Amino acid sequence: MDAVIARYIDTEMEAAQAIADNPQMSAEEKMFRILRASGQDNARGDRLEKEASAVGNADMQQRTMASIVLRLSPILEGIVRQGMREGIFQTEYPRECMEILLAASEFMLHGGAFAWEGAQRLQKIKALAWMAEKALGAKKGHFNYLYEKFEKDGENCD
């Protein structure tokens, strides 16, 4: 199972890096694409998440979350630094902010430690978007796309 999860994470990180390396995209577009892609439901990712967070797999789930945080934060840090040059972000701690935001997201929303229902989960996602704006010095509403799809479509955000 570890090898399957590692391959899945490798694929996700390669996709994120390809977006980050695109010189034609603004930091805003890169961040949007990576964060929206990571929030998309897909059968394989959902199955792996459920197996990794099953009872008895806590160690595997913790290693998976740590791997995602450690591998995705430098990619997002580069995008934050680009955004700082473009004037959309302003922070003294781009790497640390991304590590903390990713860790919170992974643990609170994907770790299986909490059984948030749709409305509760939506509130957590809204709070995370608000925190990201504050931590990265972005304008109010900058990260609303993290939850607008669920609000607009009335979708379940489980």
Where are the language model's segments positioned?
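A short secondary-structure junction motif
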Residues: 11, 41-46, 83, 108-111
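Hydrophobic alpha-helical bundle segments that form small-molecule/ligand-binding pockets
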Residues: 71-105, 112-116
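C-terminal peripheral helix-coil segments that are non-catalytic and often amphipathic
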Residues: 74, 78-86, 115-158
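Hydrophobic alpha-helical connector segments
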Residues: 3, 7, 14-48, 98-101
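Secondary-structure edge/capping motif, primarily at the C-terminal ends of alpha-helices
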Residues: 19, 23, 49-53, 112-116
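Residue-level recognition of alpha-helical structural elements
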Residues: 23, 27, 90, 94, ...
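Short secondary-structure transition hinges
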Residues: 44-78, 85-89
